[in-house]
C-alpha cells in the first residue's frame, strides 16, 4: 500500500510515526472519550482494556487500571489492536467468489448474501429431509459470550452437524475431572504466596505476560522458579532452574518424583488418608512399577536431579505447579497431567493458597448462554438420541433436544469428518471464529474435504487461507465495534466490551448476522428458524446474566461493568479450599473408576510417547507476536517477525549440511514446507521447531506437516479427544544456500 493511501485512513493510524517524522502532539485527555473493552482471544490473560477515542477514531488502548491482573498494561498484541481495526486488509463488505481459490471476489449486498445462504439451507433441508448436511466449525477466534449466537443460530435452524471438541486443552480437562471432579485452579494472583513454583510445559513470558509479575514477586520473596520444558523458552531462560526433558516424558518424571516421596516418607498423610480415594493402590503401583532411575532414563534427567526436585518441592509450603497446555498435546497428554496432579496431591498442596495443580477453570463462566441455547423448529429431525453437542460450556443443541440431537464430528479431524460423513454428506460449511486451513491438521486432506462441499460461508475480518476457499465471506466486527462480555479461563476478572466506534465499513457482529439470517429464511419459508429476529444488545446481555453471576461479581447488572472490570468474590484464592471434590467419592481420586469405565487406567499410570522412524521431533508452538493465525498479519508484528524459520540444533544442522539462513525443506508423510533455517542451541539435537502463524505474503503453513493424531483424553468433557499436536515427527533437507523463500 502506498504511503499516501495509508495516510488517508482515519487519523493516519496505519502510518508509523517514524515514517512521517512528525513532531509529537501534546496529549490532552479532555479531547478523548474512553470506552471499556476486553481482549476476547484464546489467551490466558483476557486483558481488561480502556480504549481512547478521538473524533470517532481509536487512537490507542491501555490496560484497565481497576484490574489487578491486567494492571494497566496490555501485551504487544493488545497494543496493536488499532492496527487491526484500521487495517486496509480488513474484509469490508459481503463478498462472493466465483470459483473457490480463484481470488475473483465481487462485492455483494448483505441482502444478496443472506438470500443465497438461506436458499442453500432450504435446498439442503428439501434434499435430505433434515439440516444435518449443514455443518458449523467454530472455536476461539472470539470468546465473548454473545459470539455463541453462532451456535444458537445453527440450533434454531434444526439439528445440524457440529465439529465438537477443542484443539486447545481437552486432555488436561478430562484428566483433572477424573482426579478432582472438575477443572478448577487457584487465582493466578496468589502465586505470590508460593515458596516453590514449577512451570511445566508452559511459556508465560510469551503466553501470559501478566502472570509473570506474580512469579517474579514470589521469587523476590524467596521462591525458587523451575521450568520443565523440552525447549529453552523465554520463561525457561528466566528461571532459577531449567530442566530439559524429552517430549512426552512428563508423566514418567512426575511418577519418579512421586516414588521418591514414598521412599523418603514425604507424602502428606493427612491428605491421602482423609481427603483422597485410592491412594494405597497408587502407592502400590509406584512401588511395583516405578523407580527414580527408570524415570531418569525415560525423561533424560539424572536420578539425583529428580530426587532433588521432589525434595525441594515438599520442603516448603506452599508449592505449586503450573501445568501448561502444550504439555498435554501429546498422545499421552492426559496421562501425563494425571501423574502431575497426583504428585501435587501427595505433597499436600491441593486446596492451599499459593499451591495447587494449576491448569485452568470455567468457574466464572456461569452465563445463561441464552444466545447459544436456541430451540429447533417444530418437526425438526436429526440423529436419534437426547444428547446435544458437547463443548467446554455444555450442550449447544438446545435444552429441549429430547428425541434428536446434532451430528457430532471431531473438530481435531475436521477434514476426515467431512470426507467420511454420509447419509447425508456435509454439503455446506459455516466457518466462524476459526481458520481451519491455518489451525486444523493435515492441510492436504483439508483441501480435498473442501472440494467435496457445495457451499462454504466464512464470517471473518481478513482474507485468510480459509476465506480463500470459501464461496461467500461475511465481514464481522472487531471487539471495539460490538457489545459483549468476556470472562477468563485463568484469572477471575469479568469485563465488558462496549462499542468504542461504529462498525467499520459494512461489518456486523455474529449476533446481528444470526438475526438477519432468521428474518431472511423465515420470509422464504415461514417457521424455518426460531432465532429471534430483533437485534437489541441490551436485551441479549440482560438474558445472559443471572443471580449467580451477579452475586459472584458483586454487581446488580452488566451495566456495572461499564465502571470497570469486576473480580469474582470467592471465599479463598485456592481451588478446592474446602477439599470437597466433585468426584464420585467426593475426594481426590488417585484411583478413578470413571477413568477406567471410559477406557483409561484407573490409576495415573505411565503411558509412553509416540515413536517414529523419522529423525526429528516436530514442535509447532505459537509465536510471541501472534495467537495462532491472528495478529501476525499486522504491520507492527511483521516488523518484529517478518519471516518464518525452522529452528535446528547446531550439531544436527552440521550433519545435514545446513547453515544459518539456508533454504531447507521440512517434510514427512503428511506434506512439506520450504523456509529458511535458524541454528540455535535453544532446541534439542533431535528437534525441529516451527512457529505456527499466518504469513499472508508467504506460502507457509505448519499444518502441511502436522497430522490429525488424537491425544489420549478429551472425549468425556469436550466431545472429542484432544489433538496430539506435539507428537509429530519430520525430517529436513538442504535445498538452497542462504536464500530467502518468496
Give the ranges of each region predicted by the language model.
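N-terminal export/assembly segments and adjacent metallocofactor-ligating motifs
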Residues: 1-264, 275, 282, 302, ...
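N-terminal leader/propeptide and maturation segments of large enzyme subunits in energy/redox metabolism
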Residues: 95-112, 129-130, 264-303, 384-388, ...
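Conserved short loop/turn motifs at secondary-structure junctions
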Residues: 134-143, 297-301, 324-331, 363-364, ...
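Extended redox/cofactor-interaction regions of prokaryotic respiratory oxidoreductases
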Residues: 148-216, 221-227, 251-255, 344-468, ...
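Acidic/polar loop patches that form or flank catalytic/metal-binding clefts of enzymes
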Residues: 162, 268-270, 306, 320-321, ...
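Glycine/threonine-rich phosphate-binding loop and adjacent beta-strand/alpha-helix elements that clamp
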Residues: 188, 480-503, 514, 518
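Short acidic (Asp/Glu) and glycine-rich catalytic loops that position anionic groups and cofactors
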Residues: 233-238, 285-291, 315-323, 393-394, ...
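Long, contiguous, secondary-structure-rich segments that constitute the structural scaffold
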Residues: 510-561, 629, 634-647, 651-742
Amino acid at each position: 500500500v502506498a504511503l499516501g493511501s495509508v495516510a488517508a485512513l482515519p487519523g493516519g493510524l496505519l502510518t508509523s510515526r517514524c515514517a512521517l517524522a512528525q513532531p509529537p502532539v501534546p496529549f490532552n485527555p479532555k479531547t478523548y472519550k474512553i470506552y471499556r473493552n476486553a481482549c476476547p482471544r484464546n489467551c490466558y490473560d483476557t486483558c481488561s482494556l480502556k480504549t481512547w477515542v478521538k473524533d470517532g477514531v481509536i487512537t490507542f488502548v491501555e490496560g484497565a487500571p481497576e484490574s489487578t491482573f491486567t494492571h494497566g498494561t496490555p501485551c504487544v498484541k493488545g497494543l496493536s489492536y488499532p492496527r487491526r481495526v484500521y487495517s486496509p486488509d480488513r474484509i469490508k463488505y459481503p463478498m462472493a467468489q466465483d470459483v473457490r481459490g480463484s481470488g475473483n471476489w465481487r462485492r455483494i449486498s448483505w441482502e444478496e448474501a443472506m438470500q443465497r445462504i438461506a436458499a442453500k439451507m432450504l435446498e439442503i433441508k428439501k434434499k435430505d429431509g433434515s439440516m444435518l448436511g449443514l455443518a458449523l466449525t467454530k472455536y476461539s477466534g472470539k470468546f465473548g459470550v454473545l459470539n455463541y449466537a453462532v451456535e444458537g443460530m445453527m440450533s434454531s435452524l434444526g439439528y445440524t452437524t457440529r465439529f465438537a471438541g477443542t484443539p486447545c486443552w481437552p486432555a488436561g480437562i478430562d484428566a483433572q475431572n477424573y482426579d478432582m471432579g472438575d477443572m478448577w485452579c487457584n487465582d493466578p494472583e496468589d502465586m505470590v504466596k508460593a515458596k516453590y513454583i514449577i512451570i511445566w510445559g508452559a511459556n508465560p513470558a510469551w503466553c501470559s505476560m501478566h502472570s509473570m509479575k506474580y512469579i517474579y514477586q514470589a521469587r523476590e520473596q524467596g521462591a525458587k522458579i523451575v521450568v520443565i520444558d523440552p525447549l529453552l523458552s523465554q520463561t525457561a531462560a528466566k528461571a532459577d532452574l531449567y530442566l530439559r526433558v524429552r517430549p512426552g516424558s512428563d508423566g514418567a518424571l512426575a511418577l519418579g518424583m512421586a516414588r521418591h516421596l514414598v521412599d523418603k516418607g514425604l507424602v502428606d498423610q493427612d491428605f491421602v488418608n482423609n481427603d483422597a480415594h485410592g491412594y494405597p493402590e497408587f502407592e502400590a503401583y509406584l512401588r511395583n512399577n516405578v523407580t527414580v532411575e527408570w524415570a531418569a532414563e525415560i525423561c533424560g534427567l539424572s536420578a539425583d536431579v529428580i530426587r532433588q526436585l521432589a525434595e525441594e518441592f515438599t520442603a516448603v509450603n506452599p508449592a505449586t505447579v503450573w501445568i501448561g497446555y502444550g504439555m498435554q498435546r501429546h498422545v499421552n497428554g492426559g496421562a501425563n497431567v494425571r501423574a502431575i496432579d497426583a504428585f501435587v496431591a501427595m505433597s499436600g498442596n491441593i486446596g492451599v493458597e499459593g499451591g495447587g495443580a494449576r491448569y485452568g477453570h470455567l468457574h466464572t463462566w456461569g452465563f445463561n448462554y441464552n444466545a447459544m441455547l436456541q430451540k429447533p423448529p417444530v418437526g425438526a429431525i436429526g440423529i436419534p438420541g437426547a444428547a446435544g453437542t458437547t463443548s467446554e460450556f455444555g450442550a449447544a443443541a438446545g435444552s429441549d433436544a429430547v428425541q434428536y440431537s446434532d451430528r457430532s464430528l471431531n473438530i481435531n479431524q475436521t477434514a476426515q469428518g467431512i470426507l467420511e460423513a454420509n447419509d447425508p454428506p456435509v454439503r455446506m460449511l459455516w466457518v466462524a471464529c476459526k481458520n481451519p486451513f491455518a489451525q486444523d491438521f493435515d492441510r492436504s486432506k483439508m483441501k480435498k474435504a473442501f472440494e467435496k462441499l457445495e457451499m462454504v460461508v466464512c464470517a471473518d475480518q481478513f482474507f485468510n487461507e480459509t476465506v480463500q476457499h470459501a464461496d461467500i465471506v461475511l465481514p464481522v466486527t472487531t471487539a471495539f465495534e460490538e457489545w459483549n462480555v468476556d470472562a477468563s479461563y485463568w484469572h477471575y476478572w469479568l469485563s465488558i466490551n462496549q462499542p468504542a466506534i461504529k462498525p467499520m465499513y459494512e461489518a456486523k457482529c455474529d449476533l446481528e448476522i444470526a438475526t438477519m439470517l432468521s428474518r431472511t429464511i423465515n420470509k422464504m419459508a415461514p417457521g424455518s428458524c426460531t432465532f429471534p429476529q430483533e437485534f437489541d444488545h441490551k436485551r441479549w446481555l440482560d438474558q445472559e446474566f443471572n443471580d449467580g453471576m451477579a452475586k459472584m461479581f458483586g454487581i446488580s447488572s452488566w451495566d456495572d461493568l461499564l465502571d470497570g472490570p469486576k473480580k469474582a468474590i470467592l471465599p479463598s484464592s485456592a481451588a478446592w479450599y474446602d477439599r470437597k471434590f466433585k468426584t464420585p467419592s467426593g475426594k481426590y481420586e488417585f484411583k478413578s473408576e470413571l477413568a477406567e469405565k471410559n477406557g483409561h487406567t484407573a490409576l495415573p499410570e505411565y503411558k509412553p510417547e509416540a515413536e517414529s522412524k523419522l529423525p526429528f521431533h516436530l514442535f509447532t508452538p505459537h509465536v510471541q507476536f501472534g495467537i495462532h493465525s491472528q495478529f501476525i498479519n499486522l504491520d507492527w508484528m511483521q516488523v518484529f517477525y517478518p519471516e518464518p524459520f525452522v529452528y535446528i540444533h547446531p550439531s544436527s544442522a552440521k550433519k545435514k549440511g545446513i547453515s544459518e539462513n539456508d533454504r531447507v525443506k521440512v517434510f514427512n508423510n503428511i506434506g512439506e514446507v520450504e523456509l529458511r533455517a535458524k541454528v540455535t542451541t535453544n532446541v534439542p539435537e533431535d528437534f525441529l521447531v516451527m512457529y505456527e502463524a499466518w504469513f499472508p505474503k508467504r506460502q507457509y503453513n505448519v499444518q502441511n506437516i502436522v497430522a490429525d493424531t488424537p491425544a489420549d483424553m478429551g472425549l468425556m468433557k469436550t466431545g472429542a479427544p484432544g489433538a496430539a499436536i506435539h507428537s509429530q515427527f519430520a525430517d529436513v533437507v538442504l535445498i538452497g544456500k542462504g536464500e530467502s523463500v518468496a
